[in-house]
Amino acid sequence: MSLDDLQAATKIQKRYLTALEEGNYDIIPGKFYVRAFIKQYAEAVGLDADQLFEEHKKDIPNTYHDDVSEKISGMNLQKEMPKPASKALELLPTILVILGVIVVIAIVYAIIQFANHKNSDDHNAASEKAITQSESKYEIPKDSTLKENQNNSSEKETDTKKETKENEDKKKENDSEKLEIKAAGTEGSLTTYEVSGADKIELELKASDSSWIRVRDENSSSLKEGTLKKDETYKKDITDQKQVDIRTGYAPNLKIKINGKVLSYELDPKKVMAQTIKIVNKKEEKSS
């Protein structure tokens, strides 16, 4: 992967990328950024950042600063002298009386609430019993026409839901069968694909291992940007998009599907690891 590809994938300036590769950490502004840049670099090329930190911990600066002396100097170590407690002792009897009154009030309130709640429960139980007895007088016979109609309605609703699901599954299969994916050409690390033939187009990105991605719509607005973890999947309906650009920092770890069909890389991912995939929707406009 070239420095230009790494810069595009990680957003780190090339001079800092060169410094990372050469182990020249002094030109990077701050120890925190050294570790942050190394982590981004590792993710872009498919390496384990934690393993890198462990193997090169003697060379990579630590973000922890042992500045205990400065922190101690800024602390106020003066101890306050205990204040006279005589005034508090004078108020103690009054405080105890107030607390006692509060406790008594709380107990009385709890007793009243319990009594009201019990009366309410008894009243509700009596009402429910009366309603149950009333309903039992008008219970619908098991063989009545009304119950038969209810059963028929329930069966029809179940059949309708089943038929709707079957139609949806059939439509997805038809879209997948009618879909055509055509490689229109490559330029540098960019490959353009044209898709047509399907009424609905769904994009699916799945990472076999950590892989950074960026997805933009026809207006260059970001739809997704970040690192997909191992076995993580991103899906997006792009039926209404004229085109979608997909940038991957490490193509060997990323599988691209359209309507379930795997898109084959025109550029060998092992040779061109950072790639841009442009999906152009060639769906024909329906005449009015």
Curated annotation (Swiss-Prot):
Alphabetical list of Gene3D superfamilies matching this protein: lambda repressor-like DNA-binding domains
Renumbered residue ranges of the record's region Disordered: 121-183
InterPro entries: Bact_Cytoskel_RodZ, Lambda_DNA-bd_dom_sf, RodZ-like_C
Disulfide bridges in this chain: none
GO cellular component: plasma membrane
Residue ranges of the TM segments: 92-112
Keyword field contains Ribonucleoprotein: no
Location(s), subcellular: Cell membrane
Recorded topology in the membrane: Single-pass membrane protein
Biased composition (Basic and acidic residues): 136-146, 154-181
Keywords: Cell membrane, Coiled coil, Membrane, Transmembrane, Transmembrane helix
GO molecular function, one term: DNA binding
Coiled coil spans: 147-185
Keyword Transmembrane tagged: yes
Pfam family, one: HTH_25
Protein name: Uncharacterized membrane protein YmfM
Organism: Bacillus subtilis (strain 168)
Lineage of source species: Bacteria, Bacillati, Bacillota, Bacilli, Bacillales
